[in-house]
Amino acid sequence: MYDSKKLELKWQEIWDKEGIFEPKKDYNLQKKYILSMFPYPSGRIHMGHVRNYTIGDAISRYYRMQGYNVLQPIGFDSFGMPAENAAIKHKIHPKKWTYDNIDYMTKELFRLGFSFSKNRILATSDPIYTKFEQEFFIKMFEKGLIYRKNAVVNWCEQDQTVLANEQVEDGKCWRCGNEVVQKEMPGYYLKITSYADELLSCLKDLQNHWPSQVITMQENWIGKSFGLEFDFKFDDESSKKLGGVKSFKVFTTRPDTIYGMSYAALAPEHAVVKAVLEKNLVSKETADKIKKILNQSPRERQANDKDGAFLNLFAIHPLSGKKIPVWMANFVLAEYGGGAVMAVPAHDERDFEFAHKFNLPIIQSIGAKNGENVKLPYIESGILVDSAEFSGLENEDAKMKIIEKFEKEKIGKRVTNYKLRDWGISRQRYWGAPIPMIKCPKCGLVPEKIKNLPVTLPDDIKITGKGNPLDKHPTWKHCTCPKCGAEAERETDTLDTFFDSSWYFARFTSDENMWQEKGIDEKSANYWMNVDQYIGGIEHAILHLLYARFFQKVLRDLGYLRDSEPFANLLTQGMVLKDGAKMSKSKGNVVDPDEIIEKYGADTARLFILFAAPPQKELEWNDSAVEGAYKFLNRLYERSQNVQKTREIPKIDQSSLNKAEKYARLKVYEALQKSSEVYEKTFAFNTLIAACMEALNALNAQENRQILTEGYFIILNLLDPIVPHIACELSENLFGRANFTPIKILPEVFEKDEIRLAVTVNGKKRAEIEVASDLSQSEILKIAKEQVLKWLENKKIIKEIYIKNKLVNLVVK
């Protein structure tokens, strides 16, 4: 049994001393930037981390072997609520808790032999990182990409902080699981909507480079749609009730159904609904119902049954002139299309469900093209019916003609809408990057001076879990205005942690010599960016990956970066499961990587992780399979004793080999042939490992020491990115070197002793023959004719065609 602990420590010390994983500063070299999503420093790494970083490390080591200049950095997404929760629970400062965890996790990661650049390790809570992040914030603010406004937000009472829509899951906070309520608050917003079109259009450049599922999820989240926007006018009585409000805007993607409208529906947050409540235009019972729905998050409303209330208001149909009742409905989103819809229950499932519940009219305006009766709601394409001059038109044609009518009469227009909303980035917590803004009673909102950055957090803080700790600090928020010098107050909100993780990939590119000088060194960034291979979980498809794409475009426009997309290729790895469920302490099914390393070694953990399943699939933990991986490495180590020690790899005469020797050599070269596709495209490491195992078995089944020696040299080369410690040890012992280089594929190894050929007569297959591969063409033709004699009787052969190693075709007449 080999001593994995001793062997692995030896090679980790060698790699560290030689600094071989630090990227070279020669920007003329071909480069590869391989990045796995950085972890939150929760205290210990888990098997999900091991899988993520083993995949990235295997790819990185492969490209170094191919002669590329490789950047593979690591850092920590180190701001966030868990540190504050730990401060309350364990009476420890968030900073100490965070950096203690970073120290421990860094040691764990390097115990696994990951080839990270040690000179570029960062934490987003480092003051130097905060400095440049605040500089970017100020530049975005000055460009109008960040603004402050009052808005109804998702509020978590437990964490006492604002949540982005994406952070609300089934009406609950994504972190603590508590119910989320709606609350109006001031906050800072990133104008991601100003890049909506580019974020959408650039997705086409990522086709075949990103998983299609991620692209679809982002397309749906951005939610671009075309349609008609018009002012829906109140009747005189309703306008009078509302104090002179004349109309409200409506957006619809289905103007072809406008003659089927039977009611209008407003979002609970709509200004008209607010006016109805303020002016007591509905009963107390109805008002209470509206207020109850108002306090539900948008996602909670979507999950509930359709509900609403009549507002005692009517609007006038813009084309027919009919009076249309105006309702509040829980399924209408305040953030989309102005928060108002024209409801057509005959041709929309949600409208139909609502109308059915409240006994509202259902008016059909589209029928089937074949004239047959249809079941409502009918949402397919068809022919307009009972739609004035548009009756008889196909609905797609009618859409444009109805919009043209609205535009001609100047009562509406064609518009583009997005589901994507601006990103709220204010958080009411201590452990986050301070927002570098100052509230001056004279000047208003003023950014801090760049020379005064970073604005850092006070260490003397009391964290109770209630309210904003910075707001309660006795001195920290008091300052002078950078503009006029008057007494002022700092912004006490901190940045959403997704802000921190939206540019870290660009920070990693900065040469360590420029680390303190620039947040992003343009020369280095233009060489390294974009990331050639990004690796992380699909759960980040919308949040992190969309925000990172947005930041890339903003930083490009600010002159820091050149590329429009941050990640050229994306691999989303599956979760690690045990007993069919995601590993968690509550389920008691956690496997501690430290215990696996202690018992079997890092190489065994790496081998199992890459062999157990393709990276894109879920991986089921299997103790016996871990044991099997360990046994394979022991077998590889023990049988290396039969290998000839040499600095020159044997040159082998293929023609002199027997069948077992040829087979063993073939299996080795088949694995070699597979390797480039695995490491560069498919990442199906399990298939490469299986091929190496098969090759090793074949090598051990024959007795030619030269074949064994050549085979070991190649197999160690192929396995080095996966099990680098044992591969380096054996290569040094056997071949006097541990620096692996590409190996040429020898075509003669794949030449078979016998070949199988199809025999066709006039193009029709009549037989198959197996012949020696060195047989002449005339001999092959002779054998082929003998096999198809009955199809040649009384026929004249006018042409004989031989396609080497494939077929013989006899043309007869």
UniProtKB/Swiss-Prot annotation:
EC number annotated for this UniProt entry: 6.1.1.4
PROSITE patterns: AA_TRNA_LIGASE_I
Residue numbers covered by motif 'KMSKS' region: 582-586
Gene Ontology MF annotations: aminoacyl-tRNA deacylase activity; ATP binding; leucine-tRNA ligase activity
Pfam families in the record: Anticodon_1, tRNA-synt_1_2, tRNA-synt_1g
Superkingdom to which the source organism belongs: Bacteria
Keywords, alphabetical: Aminoacyl-tRNA synthetase, ATP-binding, Cytoplasm, Ligase, Nucleotide-binding, Protein biosynthesis
Any one cellular-component term (Gene Ontology): cytosol
Catalyzed reactions per annotation: tRNA(Leu) + L-leucine + ATP = L-leucyl-tRNA(Leu) + AMP + diphosphate
Annotated transmembrane regions: none
CDD domains: Anticodon_Ia_Leu_BEm, LeuRS_core
UniProt keyword Isomerase present: no
Recorded family membership: Belongs to the class-I aminoacyl-tRNA synthetase family.
Name of the protein in question: Leucine--tRNA ligase
Organism annotation: Campylobacter hominis (strain ATCC BAA-381 / DSM 21671 / CCUG 45161 / LMG 19568 / NCTC 13146 / CH001A)
